[in-house]
Amino acid sequence: MEAGQQWPGKTDFYLQLPKVELHAHLNGSISSSTMKKLIAKKPHLNVHGHMTMIDKGKKRTLQECFQMFQVIHQLTTSAEDILMVTKDVIKEFADDGVKYLELRSTPREENATGMTRKTYVESVLEGIKQCKQENLDIDVRYLMAIDRRGGPTIARETVELAKEFFLSTENTVLGLDLSGDPTIGQANDFLEPLLEAKKAGLKLALHLAEIPNREKENQMLLSLLPDRIGHGTFLSASEAGALDQVDFVRQHQIPLELCLTSNIKSQTVPSYDQHHFGFWYSIAHPSVICTDDKGVFATYLSQEYQLAAETFNLTPFQVWDLSYESINYIFACDNTRSELRKRWTHLKQKVLNCNEVNYF
């Protein structure tokens, strides 16, 4: 079964389903329409669509995926670019029925345009603010990402930025993400800044166990007791030490952000039916369906829910509960959770009635 395959009559249910998106990288979420605008602004780069998106039925290695992000970064080099991208991405998630979104992105500096890490962050926040002023039906927050390639020095600078904006943005900046090429850098380099962030009250969403044979690193990052885990693909593998990590994650009920199409197209998981969502869902572990990079992987959250439901034979009520329970794992405050639950409850009958007409 390929991502993008349509099931006639069922699509409305997944689109109308209210959803929470907790693992979405800003630059990886740029749609083809926004990408065309960026490419038109920089024709000298000679970038084409296939260099920034993996089409239906195609796959790349994880390393090739990270190379694609380098191409995308060449297109988003100014504060104006970041503002436009942020607004477009938010609007597209809203159009897909996402009611709460935590966007993550690494603050970057670009000497050629004068963009600093701080103005990068300010551009993301301005995009969030403008979408709110336009009364879009979506609540958006921001997680600052530490890219492993930057090393410990830039990690510390990012933590300082996050602390500054955490205090000044009225709960818009909520936490930190550790991401980037998992083969670069040592986890030990990031423990101190991440711990400092945690002490300051910032939440931690850490990419963890994306690739095999990283038991020692996984243990180090788990020692921080992250608030959520991104991917966790090889936590459930039967390699030495991995079983202990599964038990640790289960005992501490650390929610997992699971991105099916991303893992298939980057070839860290061989097929949808072998995706580790099946294992974690079967033991009722806190799990959230996410897109990761909806632009690069040519997907959207409604489609990811549909893929999970079709692959693992979930009933419409199980799909609803999966979405509803994801509210528990957001980084915003209890009041926000309460408001979201009210919205879900208000929409429930309408969405499930739509399902009764179209699903079977």
Curated annotation (Swiss-Prot):
GO terms for molecular function: metal ion binding; N6-methyl-AMP deaminase activity. Signal peptide: none annotated. The active site is at 210 (proton donor). The record marks 231 as: Important for catalytic activity. It comes from the Eukaryota. It catalyses: N(6)-methyl-AMP + H2O + H(+) = IMP + methylamine. N(6)-methyl-AMP binds at residues 25, 27, 73, 105-108, 147, 180, 210, 292-293. The keyword Nucleotide-binding does not apply. Keywords: Hydrolase, Metal-binding, Nucleotide metabolism, Zinc. Binds 1 zinc ion per subunit. GO terms for biological process: nucleotide metabolic process; response to alcohol. Disulfide bonds: none annotated. Its cofactor is Zn(2+). SUPFAM superfamilies: Metallo-dependent hydrolases. Belongs to the metallo-dependent hydrolases superfamily. Adenosine and AMP deaminases family. Monomer. Catalyzes the hydrolysis of the free cytosolic methylated adenosine nucleotide N(6)-methyl-AMP (N6-mAMP) to produce inositol monophosphate (IMP) and methylamine. Is required for the catabolism of cytosolic N6-mAMP, which is derived from the degradation of mRNA containing N6-methylated adenine (m6A). This is N6-Methyl-AMP deaminase. The lineage of its organism: Eukaryota, Metazoa, Chordata, Craniata, Vertebrata.
